């Protein structure tokens, strides 16, 4: 037996042996492994052979003392021993079966092999021979069967362990379950549950403030500086934070506990509309305002993007490389913009003050062109035909560049067919190239291009093939009314990304974008997203994307045909821009607009042609009339001269001179900068028509109205404090040192530098208040006072809406503001002063005041005056806007004679009256009321202005509701106690019972303002008949036509809609497509000559200024206070004083 087997001897004590046997009995029987079967069999056989001698030895040892026994007994004993051996072997077999189930290993030895190996049979034989000499010396105890079975069970356990090995995932899961414990709250941890961050009622509130759009960031920075500056002062501003969102323009948000803190923070900051108030943001809306929605940008090669920054902003580009997209860089290909202007011209352009960074046009890279301008060394040739110029790589004419991902826009790219075609190498839209390769860029139709009523179809998804009419549009879902199929007539919602516009062959469509914008034609072919149409002009095929088309309106009467336009025709490019045709070339028109810009447009881009040569008239720089056919020349600038062939709005004059090559001999100039080449007589001396203007002062004094010079005495402008309002020096303050023609030499205060500035770019600045006024007032206005001015009058009144304090000392006898002429009046009213000067000094002519801008001109050359006076433009007696000459208005615009100032009896029925429409059955209708004028023998009562004709021919006031009536009530005596400053002996006779003279200074404003047949208040106020074509989204009223020479009926649809109010947004030629406010289902196309503005009738209404000067026209304001027909508007940011506008110059806005 080997030494290893000896080490596996039975247990030392019987107790341990019994315990081992008990544990072995619990073990389950095992199936013998085939690989171990031979070894096990051999081991069992060896054990059987060894057991027999051991038993014999034991038997000899046990019976050593029984010598001499009989052999018969030995045989019996041997038989008994054999039986016992058989029984022992059976017991051992039973014990072996029970011990087949070995005990389980300890956990610490599960993955360790701690069993000793058993030597093979040959080694055992060698060891037996080696120990043969001492074989009898060693007392070999009988082997325990359990040790043998233990070895076999261990081997078997390793086999079962491999089969029953657990899965790795199961082990990991069990370890997680074992070690995972409940997370305990750590008071020192920085992690805060999200629900604890939500604002509550005890947290500071969030307030929103309305600001000027585009200045949100600047205003936030101003609030920061203001809060920090007052942080350690006695009254710090309790504002916690302020921010704005780019997605919410015109709004900033301030975090504070009280609204008073917000008001203190924004007070005095320009650009904040405090009239809108400070509004509290609800708690549930506070958290979403701070959420930043991050959008994942998915860029793929071939994708179309647009560049955001630099000179390529807005240019189309194509993604070519996304290898570095993880680093935030993407490679794009785009058409470069290289400035190929010669160096000499660039230097000249910079020297004369023109901007040097002009954006060059987009064109493909050309090596020869770049080399000529920048030199051979500036361009290097790279591999595979590429070029390197200015650190950029150019391949096939395109620039290949790596840019940051935020520098490109991936949404709403909407490339046009013309833009994409340039990437294919052909700019012609009719070229033969594969449209399917570029149509994928326009599959996703932007919902901004869809409107209710458009016909669309679904081209992908579960609803492919479904088509219908759009009913509602949202950012992601479009509701359509299905046509055809099982869902016919039902409203179905489809995803916006899966639809495209649908057009049928034969439909008349209009192009919305691209090179052929506004072109119209008939659809001849539809192929996927590409629609081919036959243009109405030129009969050429145009290919465009379906997204760039829309069904055209019925344009039967407006369809442009070839040959409709001729050279020098005036056309309208939009509602406010006019131009003349300088050349007709093929299907394009070369046009020079009113601003002097030349452009090529298609006839589809022209709204309408204006044929106004017969009625066009304007006034030149000397006050003389000019008309078509006159030869004029410029008074400044290039001193060009030419023949007038058209005039737009009496401001822009188009002239032609065949000697000029630019724009084919056509140029445009302003009327006030022209003078006649041939001498003309002075303007009509209207004093001969009205002898009352030549009356002498009492007691033989000189004439009250001497003829002044036509131009302003510009020497008075010297040493006047002015501010520059235009040009590169805008905002600088200086003093005029000299006046040379139309320019003034201004010495700037901040650096004593002298500049030459045009007078039109200067305004006078008050040293005390900082207010600015027109420059002409420096030579016109005098110090405060004069006849009628209150002495030592303050600048402002306590009552903001009334009083008689002059607004500014230089305004003369105004009570109290610029726009007056009324007694009593609001703060902005004024009463004429016969000896004081001022802007808009009064409605009645003042012989001693220049009255620049006044409604009724005085002795000076006042632009816009309507009552005749020396040098007055137009010299007209009627109310505002009468277009004909110095005539007293009457029916049919036929002038009548002003009654004889010296006549004591009414003139005859057909002469000497101021005719007016509508006698209303009065017996004095065809004549004049007896004059209250005194004969020449009584000079003390002689008036010094035109007598006011009596009778209903010129009632004072005229018919009720007329905005131009005189403020003296007709039929009642003028109160003698009226506190109107003036000189009684110079007062005009105000009509009324009795022959007394009211203390009204220098005549009442009594131009006849009654509604005449065929003319309306708009025409009298200066509003042209087509005023409505300059505005949109306004409310209008329908009335009789007031277009001169109109061939349309007097009433629109026989007066069915007279007095009704409409709102409109669409303009079609000279018509508007308007919706009846009382019944939105009624839509009418109404000519502009029937439209009148809807007047404001209450405060808080949003209106637009449709008349007045260019600085006011077009402004949108909110009415605040009304007095005497004029409205004061709410203050807005940047206002120096309240804006007051005559109610006749306002029109209500339709949709706010």
From Swiss-Prot:
Residues 68-95 have a biased composition (Acidic residues). One of its GO terms (cellular component) is DSIF complex. The keyword Ligase does not apply. Residues 1-104, 906-966 are annotated as: Disordered. Its main location: nucleus. GO terms for molecular function: mRNA binding. The keyword Transcription applies. It comes from the Eukaryota. Keywords: mRNA processing, Nucleus, Transcription. Coiled coil: none annotated. Gene3D superfamilies: 2.30.30.30, NusG, N-terminal domain. Signal peptide: none annotated. It is found in: Nucleus. Residues 939-966 have a biased composition (Low complexity). GO terms for biological process: mRNA processing; regulation of DNA-templated transcription elongation; regulation of transcription by RNA polymerase II; transcription elongation by RNA polymerase II. Belongs to the SPT5 family. Component of the SPT4-SPT5 complex. Interacts with RNA polymerase II. The SPT4-SPT5 complex mediates both activation and inhibition of transcription elongation, and plays a role in pre-mRNA processing. This complex seems to be important for the stability of the RNA polymerase II elongation machinery on the chromatin template but not for the inherent ability of this machinery to translocate down the gene. This is Transcription elongation factor SPT5. It comes from Cryptococcus neoformans var. neoformans serotype D (strain B-3501A) (Filobasidiella neoformans).
């Amino acid at each position: 037996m080997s030494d290893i087997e000896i080490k596996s001897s039975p247990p030392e004590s019987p107790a341990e042996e019994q315990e081992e046997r008990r544990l072995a009995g619990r073990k389950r029987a095992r199936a013998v492994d085939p690989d171990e079967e031979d070894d096990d069999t051999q081991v069992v056989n060896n054990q059987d052979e060894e057991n027999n001698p051991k038993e014999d030895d034991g038997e000899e040892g046990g019976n050593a003392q029984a010598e001499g026994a009989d052999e018969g007994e030995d045989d019996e004993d041997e038989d008994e021993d054999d039986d016992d051996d058989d029984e022992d072997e059976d017991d051992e077999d039973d014990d072996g079966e029970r011990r087949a189930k070995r005990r389980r290993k300890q956990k610490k030895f599960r993955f360790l092999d701690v069993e000793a190996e058993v030597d093979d049979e040959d080694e055992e034989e060698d060891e037996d021979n080696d120990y043969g000499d001492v074989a009898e010396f060693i007392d070999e105890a009988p082997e325990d069967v359990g040790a043998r079975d233990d070895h076999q069970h261990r081997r078997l356990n390793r086999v079962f362990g491999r089969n029953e090995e657990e899965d790795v995932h199961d082990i990991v899961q069990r370890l997680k379950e074992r070690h995972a414990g409940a997370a305990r709250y750590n008071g020192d941890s920085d992690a805060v549950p999200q629900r604890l961050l939500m604002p509550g009622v005890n947290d500071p509130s969030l307030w929103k403030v309305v600001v000027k759009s585009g200045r949100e960031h600047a205003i936030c920075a101003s609030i920061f500086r203001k809060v920090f500056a007052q942080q350690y002062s006695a009254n710090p501003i309790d504002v916690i934070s302020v921010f704005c969102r780019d997605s919410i323009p015109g709004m900033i948000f301030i975090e504070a506990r009280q609204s008073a803190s917000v008001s203190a923070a924004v007070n005095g900051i320009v650009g904040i509309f405090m009239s809108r108030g400070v509004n509290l943001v609800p708690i549930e809306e506070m958290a979403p305002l701070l959420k930043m929605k991050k959008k994942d940008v998915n860029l793929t090669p071939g994708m179309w993007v647009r560049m955001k920054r630099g000179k390529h902003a807005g240019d189309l580009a194509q993604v070519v490389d996304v290898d570095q997209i993880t680093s935030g860089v993407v490679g794009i290909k785009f058409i470069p913009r290289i400035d190929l202007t010669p160096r000499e011209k660039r230097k000249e352009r910079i020297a004369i003050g023109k901007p040097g960074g002009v954006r060059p046009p987009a064109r493909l890279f050309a090596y020869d062109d770049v080399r000529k301008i920048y030199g051979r060394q500036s361009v290097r040739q790279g591999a595979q035909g590429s070029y390197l110029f200015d650190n950029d790589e150019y391949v096939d004419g395109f620039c290949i560049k790596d840019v940051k991902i935020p520098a490109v826009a991936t949404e709403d790219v909407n490339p046009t067919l013309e833009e994409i075609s340039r990437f294919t190498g052909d700019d012609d839209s009719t070229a033969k190239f594969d449209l399917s390769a570029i149509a994928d860029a326009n599959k996703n139709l932007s919902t901004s291009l869809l409107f209710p009523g458009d016909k669309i179809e679904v081209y992908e998804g579960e609803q492919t093939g479904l088509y219908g009419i759009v009913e509602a549009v949202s950012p992601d879902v479009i509701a359509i009314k299905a046509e055809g199929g099982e869902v016919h007539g039902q409203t179905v919602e489809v995803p916006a990304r899966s639809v495209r516009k649908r057009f049928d062959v034969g439909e008349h469509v209009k192009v919305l974008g691209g090179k052929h914008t506004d072109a119209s034609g008939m659809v001849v072919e539809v192929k996927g997203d590409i629609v081919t149409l036959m243009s109405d002009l030129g009969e050429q095929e145009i290919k465009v994307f379906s997204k760039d088309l829309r069904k055209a309106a019925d344009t039967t009467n407006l369809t442009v045909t070839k040959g409709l336009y001729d050279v020098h025709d005036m056309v309208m490019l939009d509602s406010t821009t006019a131009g003349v045709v300088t050349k007709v070339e093929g299907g394009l028109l070369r046009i020079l607009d009113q601003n002097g810009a030349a452009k090529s447009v298609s006839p589809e881009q022209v709204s309408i042609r204006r044929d106004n040569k017969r009625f066009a008239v304007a006034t030149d720089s000397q006050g003389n009339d000019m008309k078509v056919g006159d030869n004029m020349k410029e008074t400044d600038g290039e001193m060009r001269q030419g023949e007038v062939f058209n005039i737009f709005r009496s401001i822009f004059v188009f002239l032609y001179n065949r000697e000029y090559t630019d724009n084919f001999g056509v140029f445009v100039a302003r009327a006030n900068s022209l003078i006649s080449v041939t001498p003309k007589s002075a303007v009509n001396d209207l004093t001969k028509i009205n002898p009352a203007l030549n009356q002498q002062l009492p007691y033989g004094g000189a004439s009250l109205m001497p003829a002044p010079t036509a131009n302003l005495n510009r020497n008075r402008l010297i040493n006047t404090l002015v501010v520059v309002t235009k040009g590169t020096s805008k905002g600088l303050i200086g003093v005029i040192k000299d006046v040379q023609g139309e320019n003034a030499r201004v010495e700037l205060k901040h650096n004593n530098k002298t500049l030459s500035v045009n007078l039109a770019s200067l305004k006078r600045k008050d040293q005390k208040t900082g207010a600015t006024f027109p420059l002409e007032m420096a030579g016109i206005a005098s110090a405060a006072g004069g006849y009628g001015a209150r002495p030592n009058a303050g600048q402002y009144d306590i009552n903001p809406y009334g009083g008689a304090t002059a607004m500014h000392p230089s305004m003369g006898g105004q009570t109290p503001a610029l726009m007056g002429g009324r007694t009593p009046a609001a703060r902005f009213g004024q009463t004429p002063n016969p000896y004081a000067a001022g802007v808009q000094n009064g409605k009645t002519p003042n012989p001693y005041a220049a009255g620049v801008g006044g409604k009724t001109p005085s002795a000076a050359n006042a632009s816009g005056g309507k009552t005749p006076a020396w040098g007055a433009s137009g010299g007209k007696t009627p109310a505002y806007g009468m277009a004909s000459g110095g005539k007293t208005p009457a029916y049919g615009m036929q002038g009548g004679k002003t009654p004889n100032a010296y006549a004591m009896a009414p003139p005859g029925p057909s002469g000497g009256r101021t005719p007016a429409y509508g006698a209303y059955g009065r017996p004095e209708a065809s004549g004049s009321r007896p004059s209250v004028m005194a004969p020449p023998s009584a000079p003390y009562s002689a008036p010094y202005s035109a007598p006011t004709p009596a009778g209903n021919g010129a009632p004072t006031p005229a018919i009720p509701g007329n905005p131009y009536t005189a403020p003296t009530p007709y039929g009642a005596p003028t109160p003698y106690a009226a506190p109107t400053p003036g000189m009684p002996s110079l007062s005009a006779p105000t009509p009324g019972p009795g022959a007394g003279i009211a203390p009204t200074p220098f005549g009442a404003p009594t131009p006849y303002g009654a509604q005449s047949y065929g003319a309306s208040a708009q025409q009298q106020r200066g509003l042209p008949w087509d005023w409505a074509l300059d505005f949109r989204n306004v409310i209008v009223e329908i009335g009789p036509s007031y277009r001169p020479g109109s061939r349309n009926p007097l009433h629109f649809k026989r007066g069915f809609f007279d007095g009704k109010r409409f709102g409109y947004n669409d303009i079609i030629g000279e018509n508007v497509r308007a919706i009846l406010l009382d019944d939105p289902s009624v839509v009418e196309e109404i000519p502009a000559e029937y439209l009148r503005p809807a007047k404001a009738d209450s405060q808080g209404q949003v209106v637009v200024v449709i008349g007045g000067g260019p600085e006011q026209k077009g402004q949108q304001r909110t009415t605040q206070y009304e007095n005497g027909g004029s409205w004061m508007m709410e203050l807005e940011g940047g206002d120096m004083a309240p804006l007051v506008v005559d109610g006749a110059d306002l029109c209500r806005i339709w949709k706010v």
